[in-house]
Design a protein with these regions (language model features):
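Elongated, amphipathic alpha-helical interaction scaffolds
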Residues: 13-15
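Boundary at the C-terminal end of the N-terminal hydrophobic targeting segment
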Residues: 54-58
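Hydrophobic core
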Residues: 43-47
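Bacterial N-terminal signal peptides that target proteins for export
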Residues: 5, 9, 19-41
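Soluble ligand-binding/transfer domains with enclosed cavities or grooves
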Residues: 59-86, 94-314
């Protein structure tokens, strides 16, 4: 970290400490606000200098600003699949921990299930995920690993690679394992991905209800060769009830490859829920997220041969 930036951060922290050190009657919420500011600045610095002094892209800045999100991330229309770095290829054992959840518009607007999700706070959840190499169309090869401008102008970006394959998520495998980890094996009947589009996925519950998820937009950044940040925005509809429920979901994740002391991937992930135009409170929200969930992820490699059967659309 450049000394000048680090010194400025230290001076700011010391000044805040002096300001509040001898104020026993200071308003707790005000002090909490200062703490959040300091933590936010620290996260900005971490994302700026995580693995080297590089220019932060819009997704890195967005994660650092959590939970002060006022709208959707900058995305492009989703075409094809999300391409991951080659170092993510393989099967991984994931430990996911919900560390924070926020309802920015409460008590006026609270999503169904927000309160019940508190039972997952600080509770590690384990499941398998798989990223596999596939042969892509030529257009995908030329477009891989190209982030949004102006971040793409950074000299610290890894160059595009013209390999004979690209790495993508096994969405059916991953979706099934994640759903069963949170809801139980008996609750999930199947997870199917449209063979003509990786952006359309159907999760069928044992009760006969369905969750249809369609990825509509995405973006990605590569600050350094060992970092990867991606976001996807999806339209979701819950079927099987007397009144279908619609919403929009954003998932933004920052991955960091760790090779010492042992191979692993560490990540921070934020899931944001937005109301759809069909919701009665849509204009109250005004495109702001109504629920935010922040997770800490650790991915450890699994030996070859560890797998789990999944259903696919035929």
């Amino acid at each position: 970290m450049p000394k000048s930036v680090f010194d400025k951060f230290c001076c700011f922290a010391i000044a805040m400490k002096k300001k509040y050190k001898y104020s026993p009657n200071a308003d707790i919420s005000a002090a909490g606000g200062i703490v959040r500011v300091i933590v936010g600045l620290f996260l900005v610095l971490v994302l700026l200098f995580w693995g080297g002094a590089v220019q932060a892209g819009p997704l890195a800045e967005r994660l650092a600003q959590f939970p002060q999100w006022e709208g959707f991330p900058p995305v492009k229309v989703a075409e094809g699949d999300l391409v991951y770095p080659d170092w993510m290829e393989g099967t991984w054992n994931v430990t996911s921990t919900l560390v924070e959840q926020v309802a920015p518009l409460a008590p006026d607007v609270v999503t169904p299930g927000f309160e019940s999700n508190r039972r997952y706070l600080n509770q590690p959840v384990n499941f398998l995920v798989r990223f596999q190499a596939v042969s892509p169309p030529l257009s995908t090869l030329f477009g891989r690993f190209i982030p949004l401008k102006p971040f793409s102008e950074s000299k610290n970006l890894a160059p595009a690679k013209l390999n004979s394959h690209v790495v993508v998520a096994d969405r059916a495998f991953n979706g099934l394992n994640i759903a069963r980890a949170y809801l139980g094996d008996r609750a999930i009947q199947s997870v199917k991905v449209d063979p003509n589009s990786p952006n359309r996925q159907i999760t069928s519950l044992s009760t006969g209800r369905q969750l249809v998820s369609i990825v509509t937009g995405r973006a990605a950044e590569i600050p350094t060769p060992e970092q990867f940040i991606a976001t996807e925005v999806s339209n979701q509809v819950f079927r099987g009830t007397s009144r279908p429920y619609f919403n929009q979901v954003e998932t933004t994740t920052a991955y960091q490859l760790r090779q010492l002391p042992s191979l692993a991937i560490e990540a921070w992930q934020v899931t944001a829920v937005y109301l759809s135009p069909q919701d009665a409170d849509y204009f109250k929200a005004q495109a702001r997220p109504v629920a935010l969930y922040r997770y800490r992820l650790e991915l450890l490699p699994v030996e070859a041969g560890v797998s789990q059967p999944v259903d696919r659309v035929r």
